[in-house]
Amino acid sequence: ADDDLEGFSEEDLKAIKEHRAGLAA
């Protein structure tokens, strides 16, 4: 669910997704 990502800019979303990918790795 990406509902908690509402309000973030496209750059913020990219950084968040990369951060989450790093945590999951």
UniProtKB/Swiss-Prot annotation:
Q: Which UniProt keywords apply?
A: Secreted
GO cellular component term of the entry, any: extracellular region
Kindly state the tissue distribution recorded for this protein.
Expressed by the venom gland.
Q: Does the keyword Secreted apply?
A: yes
Organism superkingdom: Eukaryota
Question: Does the record's keyword annotation contain Secreted?
Answer: yes
Q: List localization entries.
A: Secreted
**Chief localisation class:** secreted
SS bonds (residue pairs): none
Anything else the record notes?
Elutes at 29.62 minutes.
Relate the protein's function as given in its record. Unknown. Is not toxic to mammals.
Q: What family does this belong to?
A: Belongs to the non-disulfide-bridged peptide (NDBP) superfamily.
- This chain belongs to which protein, by name? Toxin Tpa3
Organism listed in the record: Tityus pachyurus (Colombian scorpion)
Starting at the broadest rank, the lineage of the source organism is: Eukaryota, Metazoa, Ecdysozoa, Arthropoda, Chelicerata
